[in-house]
């Protein structure tokens, strides 16, 4: 496997562990991880999850790993936890509330409690359609820091301004350009396409998130050669982002078939062949193309509706 190691050592560039994340966590020294990024299995009925998973299982999973997550994280380090919703009997349960309660309550008495810095909305254009409620098109990323001080490199993640030529219309800077020449703050709403069938990053994993998400977090919240941890590695997306951004990575995946996908992707990253969609604004459709034009039967249905 070359650069990829199966057992953790702080000198490793890439550690990919096939097994329970608790075993990996036990092998990592205290106060050594700069950033934890993950998207845990969250009882939404996908093929790779236990069909008996429920909210109580989700809670216990987080309670069981929290102490070791906190232990390995550096003071001043960050945790970014990406979750969605659990739908049961048409009732939507926001899982980020559960994560917030567990993480803040369990660390409240510590010298450096976890502090929620941002509740980032990840919005995407495609997903399951619903006829009984508005179709879900967003999930959450909770960014916590261990204590008050933390890395935040805004210039590394600025995005293009919509109107870069905009000028101040009053005050002492009247007539001067009002924006930052490097771009604007990406805000806490991130419009990044999710990984569906035709996405360049698509693998056989059913709940793969795009490289652009961990890539943006890694750029903003760590420095080169920092250590990134993903306890629920899945297809290795966080590892790909870490390697591309010149950070060290350690991840665990309990299912062999997804572990093998992660290994393959990281091997491709090492030789420079991994497929990544660039973190760029979502393109507006070209209305001259057939797929973007309103089909005649749709137009007819709309007229009949009116």
Predicted region positions:
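Intrinsic low-complexity, glycine/proline- and repeat-rich
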Residues: 283-306
């Amino acid at each position: 496997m070359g650069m990829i190691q199966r057992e953790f050592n702080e000198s490793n560039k890439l550690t990919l562990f096939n097994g329970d994340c608790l075993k990996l966590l036990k092998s990592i020294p205290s106060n050594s991880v700069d950033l934890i990024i993950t998207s845990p299995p969250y009882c939404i009925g996908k093929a790779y999850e236990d069909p008996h998973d429920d909210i109580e299982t989700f809670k216990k999973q987080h309670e069981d790993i929290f102490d070791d997550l906190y232990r390995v994280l550096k003071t001043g380090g960050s945790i970014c936890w990406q979750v969605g919703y659990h739908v049961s009997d048409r009732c939507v349960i926001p899982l980020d509330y559960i994560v917030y309660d567990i993480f803040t309550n369990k660390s409240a008495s510590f010298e450096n409690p976890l502090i929620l810095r941002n509740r980032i909305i990840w919005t995407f254009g495609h997903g399951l359609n619903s006829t009984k409620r508005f179709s879900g098109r967003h999930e959450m990323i909770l960014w916590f820091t261990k204590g008050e001080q933390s890395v935040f490199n805004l210039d590394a993640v600025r995005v293009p301004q919509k109107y870069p030529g905009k000028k101040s219309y009053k005050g002492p800077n009247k007539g001067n350009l009002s924006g930052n020449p490097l771009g604007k703050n990406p805000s806490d709403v991130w419009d990044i396409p999710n990984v569906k069938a035709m996405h360049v990053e698509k693998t056989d994993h059913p709940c793969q998130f795009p490289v652009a998400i961990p890539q943006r977090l890694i750029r903003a919240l760590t420095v080169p050669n920092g250590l990134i941890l993903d306890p629920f590695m899945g297809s290795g997306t966080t590892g790909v982002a870490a390697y591309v951004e010149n950070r060290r990575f350690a991840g665990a995946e309990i299912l062999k078939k997804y572990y093998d996908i992660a290994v393959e992707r990281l091997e491709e990253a090492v030789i420079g062949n991994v497929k990544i969609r660039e973190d760029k604004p979502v393109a507006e459709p070209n209305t001259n193309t057939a797929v973007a034009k309103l089909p005649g039967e749709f137009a007819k249905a709309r007229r009949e509706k009116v």
